[in-house]
UniProtKB/Swiss-Prot annotation:
It comes from Lobularia maritima. The modification Phosphothreonine is found at residue 2. The chain crosses the membrane at residues 29-46, 118-133, 142-156, 197-218, 274-288. It catalyses: 2 a plastoquinone + 4 hnu + 2 H2O = 2 a plastoquinol + O2. This is Photosystem II protein D1.
Length: 353
């Protein structure tokens, strides 16, 4: 009898826990994805803060020349970063217990791998949690689909690119100047500015910003006035009201006259699908581009291929970019290479008589 009561009580406790986890009445929805998201993101955030403040220098290139990244070792907010895991570790899974000591783990950049892997798991669970809450509320799933774009971008630079290059040391540093360094080296080694998928990503981000500003300003400018001229139009609304707040017909008419008729949407759903799809698809393409360049399928390199009828080279901006890439490649990791890879790959001229 006692055993039966204990089992019922434990089942009841588990049932109450399940109901609490999946309840949409909580101030913040947790969900089953949240059970994994909360500890992983808390771990990533905590280790990031501690390492950004106090981590010792890291031997990023694996040549016994540690690079400082924390505030206590001379950096500021702009120059500071979590330095990527050492090239000596490569792609090996490197938790604390795999190192001989905590000092060795810190010297080899163990915190970077810990932060990145927990962060990627956490943001993936956040995306799943968006879908889960939408499902519980009977909503459509497109919020999580839209969020998949930044998740794909983060996965590309923190995981796919290091896998393709063979080492977590090639991942993006977790800091402002470190991000810029990553971008410059990426351009030098992969010519990303000449990659069509990066161009689509630029169009997606800049175009999305433009369309967002246009939409917000149009809606704000075409509010249906519910008040007199002597009081704010904002006073005529309450949060969550059923009635339309703005007149899409008026906005459509304004924009159609400003540019031309078919440049404007007269259907709210089509308009908002476009506002969502444009930046999301652009960022998807950029993430796909980085994931292919990770395996050295690089941007266009015309190599002085534009010639006149006599075969003479016509210099283009593409050739200027190639020269800039060589300069950037010469300067990065100066003590790890004697020559940039592009120069070292060329066969040496014969010196015989």
């Amino acid at each position: 009898m006692t055993a039966i009561l204990e089992r019922r009580e434990s089942e009841n406790l588990w049932g109450r826990f399940c109901n609490w986890i999946t309840s949409t009445e909580n101030r913040l929805y947790i969900g089953w994805f949240g059970v994994l998201m909360i500890p992983t993101l808390l771990t990533a955030t905590s280790v990031f803060i501690i390492a950004f403040i106090a981590a010792p220098p890291v031997d990023i290139d694996g040549i016994r020349e540690p690079v400082s990244g924390s505030l206590l070792y001379g950096n500021n907010i702009i120059s500071g970063a979590i330095i990527p895991t050492s090239a000596a570790i490569g792609l090996h899974f490197y938790p604390i217990w795999e190192a001989a000591s905590v000092d060795e783990w810190l010297y080899n950049g163990g915190p970077y791998e810990l932060i990145v892997l927990h962060f990627l798991l956490g943001v993936a669970c956040y995306m799943g949690r968006e879908w889960e809450l939408s499902f519980r509320l009977g909503m459509r799933p497109w919020i999580a689909v839209a969020y998949s774009a930044p998740v794909a971008a983060a996965t590309a630079v923190f995981l796919i690119y290091p896998i393709g290059q063979g080492s977590f040391s090639d991942g993006m540093p977790l800091g402002i100047s470190g991000t810029f360094n990553f971008m410059i080296v990426f351009q030098a080694e992969h010519n990303i500015l000449m990659h069509p998928f990066h161009m689509l990503g630029v169009a997606g981000v800049f175009g999305g910003s433009l369309f967002s500003a246009m939409h917000g300003s149009l809606v704000t400018s075409s509010l249906i006035r519910e008040t007199t001229e002597n009081e704010s139009a904002n006073e005529g609304y309450r949060f969550g009201q059923e009635e339309e707040t703005y007149n899409i017909v008026a906005a459509h008419g304004y924009f159609g006259r400003l540019i031309f008729q078919y440049a404007s949407f007269n259907n709210s759903r089509s308009l908002h699908f476009f506002l969502t799809a444009w930046p999301v698809v652009g960022i998807w393409f950029t993430a796909l581009g980085i994931s292919t360049m990770a395996f050295n399928l690089n941007g266009f390199n015309f190599n002085q291929s534009v010639v006149d009828s006599q075969g003479r080279v016509i210099n283009t901006w593409a050739d200027i970019i190639n020269r800039a890439n060589l300069g950037m490649e010469v300067m990065h990791e100066r003590n790890a290479h004697n020559f940039p890879l592009d120069l070292a790959a060329v066969e040496a001229p014969s010196t015989n008589g």
